[in-house]
Design a protein with these regions (language model features):
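A short His-aromatic
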Residues: 104, 108
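Conserved N-terminal segment of class I S-adenosyl-L-methionine
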Residues: 1-103, 113-116, 200, 205, ...
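A short glycine-rich, Lys/Arg-flanked "PGG" loop and its adjoining helix->strand segment in the class I
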Residues: 113-128
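Feature marks short, surface-exposed loop/turn motifs that line or immediately flank catalytic pockets
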Residues: 71, 137-139, 178
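Conserved S-adenosyl-L-methionine
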Residues: 167-177
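Short, glycine-/aromatic-enriched active-site segment of Class I SAM-dependent methyltransferases
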Residues: 10-12, 129-151, 155-163
């Protein structure tokens, strides 16, 4: 993540309609699919300053690992539960997790399969892995550049890396269908005007609220009519059963 983007991340996560709508979609899937229980262990990979920890309390005890030290407040309320380290084989927490989250993490990595294999190695036998990634390279924009993304995924391309990592996919769902043509238009505009990448801003209150409600309404409808495309992809997976 670009350092300028990182400095704005807290405000974006807490207030921007996109982050708020993504969080609600994630929580909704967890309520459907994850059996919350006292003492359940949750790992948030790429957790930043632990901004999602309070919401995860509904499902268990959250901790995190974050490679970018500048994103972690040394005096923050969750500092004791955050390990500043890369998410690779050197990260050995000494126990397994019931749920591992990788929220918009894999697109930053040169070796996503390696990271997925490590995540699977840290899961309990019946544990779950929940992942979000940006979708479709067709809508690659300056937003991807300032975020230092390596790629965007489709269901098919993600399924390939999941199979390589030994992950059984339980759910794959596109999010933000309405945003796809908007980003496609943004890409066309950028190809003509060549603007410099800029850190996103939180819109005005009315627009921010409208876009949040639009995204939430679309996500609820997607349970009845799956979205064929979207600007994000949400995946839930697990370790394959023995002898599969």
């Amino acid at each position: 993540m670009h350092s300028e983007y990182g400095s704005a991340y807290r405000n974006l996560f807490l207030n921007h309609w996109w982050w708020r709508a993504r969080e609600e979609a994630i929580v909704g899937v967890l309520r459907e699919r994850f059996q919350a229980r006292p003492g359940a262990r949750i790992l948030d990979v790429g957790c930043g300053d632990g901004l999602f920890f309070d919401r995860l309390r509904e499902f268990g005890e959250a901790e995190g690992v974050e490679p970018a030290e500048y994103l972690v407040d040394p005096l923050g309320p969750h500092r004791s539960r955050i390990t500043i380290a890369p998410f690779d084989e050197s990260f050995q927490p000494g126990g397994r997790y019931d749920l591992i989250l990788m929220l918009d993490v894999l697109e930053h990595l040169d070796a996503p399969v390696v990271a997925l294999r490590h995540a699977i190695s840290l899961l309990e036998p019946h544990g779950l892995l929940l992942i979000t990634v940006p979708a479709f390279n067709l809508i690659w924009t300056n937003h991807d550049r300032i975020n230092q993304h390596r790629t965007r995924y489709t269901k098919a391309s993600f399924r390939r890396i999941a199979e390589d990592a030994g992950i059984k996919i339980l759910l794959a769902r596109y999010l933000f269908f309405w945003l796809f043509p908007v980003k496609l238009a943004a890409r066309a505009k950028e190809s003509l005007l060549r603007p410099a990448p800029q850190v996103p801003q939180v819109p005005g209150r009315a627009i921010n609220r409208f876009l949040f409600l639009l995204s939430r309404g679309e996500e609820k409808l997607s349970h009845l009519l799956p979205l064929p495309i979207g600007s994000s992809l949400l995946v839930m997976g697990s370790t394959p059963p023995p002898n599969s």
